[in-house]
Regions:
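Gly/Gly-Pro- and Ser/Thr-rich, intrinsically disordered tail segments characteristic of DNA damage-repair
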Residues: 1-225, 234-235, 364-420
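Short, charged/polar surface micro-motifs in flexible loops or helix N-caps
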Residues: 10, 33-36, 293-296, 348-352
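Short Gly/Ser/Thr- and Asp/Glu-enriched loop/turn motifs at secondary-structure junctions
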Residues: 98-102, 139-142, 281-285, 336-340
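Short, hydrophobic beta-strand segments
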Residues: 103-108, 304-311, 354-360
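Short, charged/polar, Gly/Pro-enriched secondary-structure boundary elements
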Residues: 111-115, 297, 349-356
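DNA-contacting surface of Y-family translesion DNA polymerases
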Residues: 189-337, 353, 419
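C-terminal hydrophobic structural anchor segments
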Residues: 325-380
């Protein structure tokens, strides 16, 4: 059996842990530069606030309903996530981190009769140890466990855990579960399935195996089998290497000068390269994109991207930053105000499988030692202590007017408790 621990409204819940007076009050968390909503409490959802809702469109609601608004505080959220995972790993044989607010639990070998109470015990313990409310879904496969965790969120009477393993119970749930909410059903397949009158997960599993394989390939067939209780997605104690690494930011205001955008893109390339090295990988493609503010329809609109390739796959910041600059030069156009830029590293492979080029002019062993030294220095003394000159020395400016304290990672911002 597999479990799925899903933190409820995670970013909003993190803010509430240190502000208990916000319990019962609408809470939203905004994206970088306070652009749009990326997390909502249940009270905020009830007001009709959507994911991705531009902040300026909800300011009237904010005043009328006393919404607590927060800028994204990823240092806090990352640390709270680590605390949740640490707690989980003390109670189950293994936990696989799936995202910042989700983890799969290995429950194989535990008696079925104990699972529901174990799930509730996990939910209570995580809440007590971290302050974060979680929903535990338990089922024979990862895909069904994801569905069970969604049910747990919808029905408070389940008391933090939903066990779903009997065929009749699974059928009852799948008959009502929308196909677009099934884990593993992407946007392209979603449209195709709906056009074929596949509205629910039950409609999906009733289709013949050949029909699924012909239209959705091996990935779709795996989901089809998982929904029928056949485990096809292995448990991974260590997270797999990412196949794409993206770093992007919205700017606090529109940028018009190439030099300003170049500095930001260089910083993005440096951050992406560090993430690449952290997972012991190399990339064979670098894509840079820039776009204007789509919410300012009165302004000229422009979006473009460009992909370039290194001579050989690399994780070297000193190669990736110039490649990103080359891509940016090809797509930058004067006369536009750019609101966002980003970089994506793709065609990712393992560092151990590198095929060297006999005529490669780069001393890769020397550069690898340099990158290791730079990463070690930044880990020890703080991010961006050592940087490439192209990214400048000033930190990236972001508009974060509603930023909370870093209660758990900065001694200067640690919470103060007063007692009479």
């Amino acid at each position: 059996m597999y479990g799925l621990c899903d933190c409820n409204n995670f970013f909003a819940s993190c803010e509430r842990v240190f502000r208990p007076e916000l319990e019962g009050r609408p809470v939203v968390v905004l994206s970088n530069n306070d652009g749009c909503v990326i997390a909502r409490s249940n009270e905020a959802k009830a007001l009709g606030i959507r994911m991705g809702h531009p902040y300026f469109q909800i300011r009237d609601l904010e005043k009328r309903h006393g919404i607590a608004v927060f800028s994204s505080n990823f240092n806090l959220y990352g640390d709270m996530s680590r605390r949740v995972i640490w707690t989980l790993r003390r109670m189950v044989p293994a936990a696989e981190v799936y995202s910042i607010d989700e983890a799969f639990l290995d429950l194989r070998g535990i008696e079925t009769g104990r699972l529901e109470e174990l799930g509730r015990h996990i939910s209570r313990t995580v809440r007590r140890n971290t302050g974060i409310p979680v929903s535990i879904g338990i089922a024979p496969t990862k895909t069904l466990a994801k569905i069970a965790s969604k049910l747990c969120k919808e029905y408070p009477k389940l008391q933090g855990a939903c066990l779903m393993y009997r065929p009749q119970d699974i059928e009852k749930v799948l008959r009502k579960f929308p196909i677009e909410d099934v884990w593993g059903i992407g946007r392209k397949h979603r449209r195709m399935l709906q056009a074929a009158s596949v509205r629910t997960a039950w409609d999906f599993v009733q289709r013949p195996e050949a029909w699924i394989r012909g239209r959705m390939g091996v990935t779709g067939l795996r989901t089809w089998k998982e929904l029928q209780g056949e485990a096809c997605i292995d448990f991974e104690s260590a997270p797999p290497a990412k196949q794409q690494i993206t770093v992007s930011r919205s700017f606090a205001h529109e940028l018009t000068q190439y030099e300003e955008i170049h500095t930001s893109v260089a910083a993005f390339a440096s951050m992406a390269a560090e993430k690449l090295r952290r997972q012991q990988s190399l990339c064979g493609e670098v894509t840079v994109y820039i776009l204007t503010n789509r919410h300012r329809e009165e302004l000229p609109q422009y979006f473009e991207s460009q992909t370039v390739r290194p001579v050989v796959p690399t994780d070297n910041t000193l190669e990736l930053v110039p490649l990103a600059a080359k891509a940016l030069q090809r797509i930058f156009r004067k006369g536009y105000g750019y609101k966002k830029a980003g970089i994506t590293l793709s065609d990712i492979s393992s560092r151990t499988g590198l095929q060297t080029d006999l005529f490669d002019p780069v001393d890769r062993a020397r550069h690898a030692r340099l990158m290791d030294a730079m990463d070690a220095t930044n880990r020890t003394y703080g991010r961006n202590r050592v940087v490439v000159a192209a990214q400048g020395f000033a930190p990236l400016k972001m508009n974060r007017q509603h930023l909370s304290q870093e209660y758990t990672t900065d001694w200067k911002q640690i919470i103060t408790v007063k007692a009479d």
